[in-house]
């Protein structure tokens, strides 16, 4: 099984930029179902290498599986920052790119997408389904440690102080940029499961990626308040197509968020992960989460 890393250029620009970095595995047999993993924040797709690999193996390479990060988080786009709204648009453009350039636009009516969103990637996925269901066919949305409600409340006091002010965002980004590469490498060795993912992530960490990560976090706190009408609309119309996995000790999505969802949608597929799995599950627990996702999708969405 080969994990492919690719730099693509979208057919439509956002702030004049089209560069998008993706990872993917290809199916061994033809299938019209495509699985899209949408990153959280940081929106660096390389963090999801192990998760995509395990998904591919658990599905016996039946489906093309893509991991896509966020525009501006690759560290190669200078002097521009992108909001969470622009990241939603970016994912629409990415799906459009796939249909036109990977699968042939004439066959687009046959292509069906499953979206797997982590953290704010869940919020982005739900918005994409809400806004673009007439353009694309969606079979399911899997919401992993989802932050579609009151994101600001889950931030630590230090992070709140950093992200809410432009001066502190710039200052921290500058500081991170000048940390010696050997220090960054050693930190990544400690937190990432493989040399492959460590090298890929390290190549994208600089002032510009840090500034985009922090700016996007700021716009998340501004945009993500109570569960909004778009999210509720998707929940009400597609509840049996949705899976929600919450963390038991996740400060971004405390127990009250889980309880609220269970109360509002008692028939929903809303569950907890194991107690030791953190919000940033991709660092050390990709296998467990990927196996649960593939199990649920196989039993509920892909059973035919």
From Swiss-Prot:
GO molecular function term, any single one: lipase activity
InterPro entries: AB_hydrolase_fold (IPR029058), LDAH (IPR019363)
Subcellular location: Lipid droplet
Reaction equations catalysed: a cholesterol ester + H2O = cholesterol + a fatty acid + H(+)
Keywords: Hydrolase, Lipid droplet
Annotated GO CC locations: lipid droplet
Principal location class: other
Gene3D superfamilies with a match to the protein in the record: alpha/beta hydrolase
Annotated active site: 119, 250, 279
Gene Ontology biological process: lipid storage
Described function: Probable serine lipid hydrolase associated with lipid droplets. Has low cholesterol esterase activity. Appears to lack triglyceride lipase activity. Involved in cholesterol and triglyceride homeostasis; stimulates cellular triglyceride accumulation and cellular cholesterol release.
Family: Belongs to the AB hydrolase superfamily. LDAH family.
UniProt protein name: Lipid droplet-associated hydrolase
Species annotation: Dictyostelium discoideum (Social amoeba)
